[in-house]
Each structure stands twice: as structure tokens, then as C-alpha cells.
Regions:
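C-terminal beta-sandwich/jelly-roll accessory domains of carbohydrate-active enzymes
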Residues: 136-168
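Loop/helix patches that line or flank the sugar-binding groove of alpha-linked glycan CAZymes
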Residues: 1-129, 135-140
């Protein structure tokens, strides 16, 4: 996301910003709204590496600003990190292609007591997969009984407690 209104190109959001500023709404409050609702935040150039403009172009500028985190968050860095988001998704896609239960299995949502955890099963024939995801910012404890299962995919180096899900 961008902190300066000058970095945004979305005409509708720029008009909203102008109208709300005229009403006296503070810049910081409007930027918080833009962070969550403006399409420009998802339109920034792909960050391929840590070269200028994230390796997206050798030109003098991009049509919209590159996220300043491109020095640390980019494809080249993610490819070398076994626990990066890119590496995790590659593993997840490989697992999905290999296990038909993840493609064709019947989906059953599991009501969970923790608001950050999404839990469900996929079942087909004699195969069953339990999927637990913590979409919060903090570790989250789940209370589901796990029997005869095998952990096949995770995004942390070390699992100390199988009932404590780390944040994604």
C-alpha cells in the first residue's frame, strides 16, 4: 500500500479522498481506508528481484509505484527460502496434484471456537484430509482431536505443539 495520495492512480479513490478531505477527514484515516479498498494496492509491478523497480522494467519508471519492500520481498529471494510464501504454494500445488482427495473430496466445514482458524475436511473413498489454517496475526490454539494423522504440509521450520497453529 502507499502512504502518499500522490502514489494512487485509481480515479474513484482519488475523488473519494478529495471529497472526504474537504469534509475534514484526516489524511491518515483516509489512507487507512485506501489501504483496504483501493485496487491500486494489488496492481503494483511484480517484484522479481532487488534491482531497481524490482526487476519489472529497465525503463525509467513504472506506471504505478513499486512497493518499497521489493528489496526484501521478491521472487528471487522467495525462490531461495524453503519457508517462503512462494515455496509453500509450490508445495501446496504439488500436493494437490498428487492427492485426489484434495481435488475431488467432499468438503465439510468444521465449526471452530477460535475466530482466526479455518478448519475443514476433504473426504473421498478411504482418504480423508484435515486442513487447519490460522489466518490471524498471532498463534492460535485449536481443540480438534487428531487421530492417526500425518502432518504433510506446513509453513514453519519447527512444530513444537501440533495444537498451536502459527500465523500465516
Amino acid at each position: 500500500y502507499y502512504l502518499n495520495i500522490e502514489d494512487y492512480n485509481d480515479v474513484g479513490m482519488l475523488k473519494l479522498y478529495e471529497i472526504e478531505r474537504e469534509k475534514g477527514v484526516p489524511h491518515d484515516q483516509l489512507i487507512e481506508i485506501l489501504k483496504k479498498t483501493c485496487r491500486d494496492n494489488g496492481r503494483s509491478p511484480m517484484q522479481w528481484d532487488d534491482t531497481p523497480y524490482g526487476g519489472f522494467t529497465k525503463g525509467e519508471q513504472t506506471w504505478i509505484g513499486v512497493n518499497p519492500n521489493y528489496l526484501e520481498v521478491n521472487v528471487a529471494e522467495q525462490e531461495t527460502n524453503e519457508y517462503s510464501v512462494l515455496s509453500f504454494y509450490k508445495k501446496m500445488i504439488t500436493l494437490r496434484k498428487k492427492e485426489k482427495v484434495l481435488i475431488y473430496g467432499k468438503y465439510d466445514y468444521i465449526q471452530n471456537q477460535h475466530p482466526s482458524i479455518v478448519a475443514y475436511t476433504r473426504t473421498i473413498e478411504h482418504s480423508k484430509a484435515l486442513i487447519l489454517c490460522n489466518f490471524g496475526k498471532e498463534p492460535a490454539q485449536h481443540t480438534l482431536a487428531i487421530h492417526d494423522g500425518e502432518l504433510v504440509l506446513h509453513n514453519y521450520k519447527k512444530i513444537d505443539d501440533e495444537y498451536l497453529l502459527q500465523p500465516y
